[in-house]
Amino acid sequence: MRALLPYLALYKRHKWMLSLGIVLAIVTLLASIGLLTLSGWFLSASAVAGVAGLYSFNYMLPAAGVRGAAITRTAGRYFERLVSHDATFRVLQHLRIYTFSKLLPLSPAGLARYRQGELLNRVVADVDTLDHLYLRVISPLVGAFVVIMVVTIGLSFLDFTLAFTLGGIMLLTLFLMPPLFYRAGKSTGQNLTHLRGQYRQQLTAWLQGQAELTIFGASDRYRTQLENTEIQWLEAQRRQSELTALSQAIMLLIGALAVILMLWMASGGVGGNAQPGALIALFVFCALAAFEALAPVTGAFQHLGQVIASAVRISDLTDQKPEVTFPDTQTRVADRVSLTLRDVQFTYPEQSQQALKGISLQVNAGEHIAILGRTGCGKSTLLQQLTRAWDPQQGEILLNDSPIASLNEAALRQTISVVPQRVHLFSATLRDNLLLASPGSSDEALSEILRRVGLEKLLEDAGLNSWLGEGGRQLSGGELRRLAIARALLHDAPLVLLDEPTEGLDATTESQILELLAEMMREKTVLMVTHRLRGLSRFQQIIVMDNGQIIEQGTHAELLARQGRYYQFKQGL
């Protein structure tokens, strides 16, 4: 239960709407009970009056009460659903924002151990499951308790013994049934949450890996694993449905026994009258209607195990401490940036081998640096240190002679423009995919930058309104690289980090892109990670890395004259 406390605290923000929903639920329940109780008494009293030949029976007042209760029940149910669901959606919106805001600082270190499907399931499905806490647990429980009190007190004016007998049965049922079915459904609910996450994780992996699975003939094997998980998931759902049916059956049985007990006790007299008359129907129908108000409570607590399991899974993410933190102080963004690295050392979590070993580097403002080396030598890790995806365990990084850790996050993001190794294409329009780098850019500026990076073909159909990603046009690897370069050019930051910007491009396009970068980034500080040797002669410095260390550094001509590793790379062309 403790896992729910942080999320119950979030409900305070919408306490008035949530409270109004509970009040409307109580009014609806009381109107429903009043309708059946008054109708039963009215019909019975009318029959008794007819048999007795009474002509003074007031038909108008009870009839008006029946109509009033019916209208109140209908209107109350409508507005209760409207208010409760609106409040629930607001709480879910707040919860999603809260969860996502907690996730952002964790990337990439805190999220590296989770698969994409698992993260998606926790952020979407587990958050959605928490709406059961209000709709299926809190509201029915509070409503049932208030209804029991009102019914007991109301009936006590007619007969104290009958009222408190019925109230005691309902109160005992309310205290015993929910904990009983919570325990019965706890393991099933936890299993459902686990299997749902496992299924979505496997489904995501199966869909994303279709090409490789088909090529290597492993698609059927993975499909079988997916089907087995689905069967287990359906079996858990079946067990939960059986528990729901059992709880409803027990509630019907208790309700029926309570009705029989009321009928037997009321037959001996009501309120001191040996002849109960139509009042016997009033107590019987009140008992029948009151137990309908208790019906949702047992089923609700059966789902509580699933709600708690989802809360634990979300808290497992949100309670993590970020590896990298930013100060809250305001920092001015510089127009030009120099860069200094002093004895930077870094090791990835749960790995023994150092990714960076004593990196020391001085980059002057406006200088262009190329970083060369084989795969896994630490080039991309070095760029990640500059974006503060990770912080070094030893050494320091300075921007304009100030520690990079002294910049707040907004200032750092404005200072650095990045072309990442893995470019993400959002399922959105071409315009939206570019505006994330420069929200204030005009359509003319976006179209011009696309033409300059060789993506003018994307403008042929629907122009900037062309839909990209899922449900739209897919981009090739080379097109994705050029889109990332377009974003970097639009961002217009003084420090530019390029991670394999020409990977996947043909020689002609590569030369055009390198010329474009040299032209548009002439006054900027540039660090480019690459495997390719084309165009490196235009860089002021070339750094060769191996095994997390800088092994060579100098100009193109100097490195060729030394006939070291860079020379060997050139000779291997």
UniProtKB/Swiss-Prot annotation:
Residues 339-572 form the ABC transporter domain. GO terms for cellular component: ATP-binding cassette (ABC) transporter complex; ATP-binding cassette (ABC) transporter complex, integrated substrate binding; plasma membrane. It is a multi-pass membrane protein. Induction: Part of the cydDC operon, which is highly expressed under aerobic growth conditions and during anaerobic growth with alternative electron acceptors such as nitrite or nitrate. Induction by nitrate and nitrite is dependent on NarL and Fnr. It comes from the Bacteria. Residues 158-161, 271-276 are periplasmic. It is found in: Cell inner membrane. Residues 20-306 form the ABC transmembrane type-1 domain. The keyword Amino-acid biosynthesis does not apply. The chain crosses the membrane at residues 16-36, 37-57, 137-157, 162-182, 250-270, 277-297. Its EC number is 7.4.2.-. It is an enzyme of class 7 (translocase). In CydC the ATP-binding domain (NBD) and the transmembrane domain (TMD) are fused. Part of the ABC transporter complex CydDC that exports the reduced low-molecular-weight thiols cysteine and glutathione to the periplasm. Export of these thiol-containing redox-active molecules may be crucial for redox homeostasis in the periplasm, permitting correct assembly of various respiratory complexes and formation of correct disulfide bonds in periplasmic and secreted proteins. CydC contains transmembrane domains (TMD), which form a pore in the inner membrane, and an ATP-binding domain (NBD), which is responsible for energy generation. Overexpression of CydDC confers resistance to exogenous cysteine toxicity. This is Glutathione/L-cysteine transport system ATP-binding/permease protein CydC. It comes from Escherichia coli (strain K12). The gene is cydC.
